[in-house]
Swiss-Prot record:
Name of the protein in question: Nuclease
Keyword Magnesium: yes
Cofactor note: Binds 1 Mg(2+) ion.
Pfam families, per the entry: Endonuclease_NS
E.C. number(s) listed in UniProt: 3.1.30.2
Upper classification of the organism: Bacteria, Pseudomonadati, Pseudomonadota, Gammaproteobacteria, Enterobacterales
Principal cellular location given in the protein's record: secreted
Gene label: nucA
Phenotypic consequence of R108K: Reduced activity 50-fold
Function per UniProt: Catalyzes the hydrolysis of both DNA and RNA, double- or single-stranded, at the 3'position of the phosphodiester bond to produce 5'-phosphorylated mono-, di-, tri- and tetranucleotides. DNA is a slightly better substrate than RNA.
Extent of the signal sequence: 1-21
UniProt KW keywords: Disulfide bond, Endonuclease, Hydrolase, Magnesium, Metal-binding, Nuclease, Secreted, Signal
Enzymatic reactions: Endonucleolytic cleavage to 5'-phosphomononucleotide and 5'-phosphooligonucleotide end-products
């Protein structure tokens, strides 16, 4: 049987699509189950992160990512783009942030951090606006940035091979609107982050943090430690959904010891 060029091209495309699907199926940015519950709409799996988009707020309900010794990188550009995997009506575009910094003193804040993950193959997706929220400059450049730095430094330890994080916004009061868009959207009033190391939080090496949008720039991130229970109650999500119920209950009601490895004092 002879194959013409069109048939060969089609076969190549089908093979590439299947290979891509197989690769995505092997990605696990959560390790012990991604969050469940809440107002979930669309989930997207990438090497850089897994996120759950909310078409009402226009921002992710949560973003999960996995830092290894190979994922950090520097010198990457910040080229903001609309997420091509989403309906444009369900997310924001770069122009929607016009005037936001001057009017609201907000930055385009990464949920999955660029510096920690720029070494992955699809690093450019870190600059998709599905992974971005309007985060107050004082928070983004202050306590949040210092927490991200300490999170990334964990991977430098010989006894740590992986850092798993899930992060997201809270909407508990009105924070105004972006002046550059007519799209309906909701600016977060707070942000949370849950971190554990290696393969499971079950050995007590985990941490949970919650920051108000108006956190002062000089604030110590260690002062914003909370339990996973508190984050679940305020978000409506179930974190670490793949763990047995009794293990979840035991861990989530108390703070973990991971902050001690991140420079926090008891």
């Amino acid at each position: 049987m002879r194959f013409n060029n069109k048939m060969l091209a089609l076969a190549a495309l089908l093979f590439a699509a299947q290979a891509s699907a197989d690769t995505l199926e092997s990605i696990d940015n959560c390790a012990v189950g991604c969050p469940t519950g809440g107002s979930s709409n669309v989930s997207i799996v990438r090497h850089a992160y897994t996120l759950n988009n909310n078409s009402t707020t226009k921002f992710a309900n949560w973003v999960a990512y996995h830092i290894t010794k190979d994922t950090p990188a520097s010198g990457k550009t910040r080229n903001w783009k609309t997420d091509p995997a989403l309906n444009p009506a369900d997310t924001l575009a770069p122009a929607d942030y016009t005037g936001a910094n001057a009017a609201l003193k907000v930055d385009r804040g990464h949920q999955a951090p660029l510096a920690s993950l720029a070494g992955v193959s699809d690093w450019e997706s870190l600059n998709y606006l599905s992974n971005i929220t309007p985060q107050k400059s004082d928070l983004n450049q202050g306590a949040w940035a210092r927490l991200e730095d300490q999170e990334r430094k964990l991977i430098d330890r010989a006894d740590i091979s992986s850092v798993y994080t899930v992060t997201g916004p809270l909407y508990e009061r009105d924070m105004g609107k972006l002046p550059g868009t007519q799209k309906a959207h909701t600016i977060p009033s707070a942000y949370w982050k849950v971190i554990f190391i290696n393969n499971s939080p079950a050995v007590n090496h985990y941490a949970a943090f919650l920051f108000d949008q108006n956190t002062p720039k000089g604030a110590d991130f260690c002062q914003f430690r909370v339990t996973v229970d508190e984050i679940e109650k305020r978000t409506g999500l179930i974190i670490w959904a793949g763990l047995p119920d009794d293990v979840q209950a035991s861990l989530k009601s108390k703070p973990g010891v991971l902050p001690e490895l991140m420079g926090c004092k008891n």
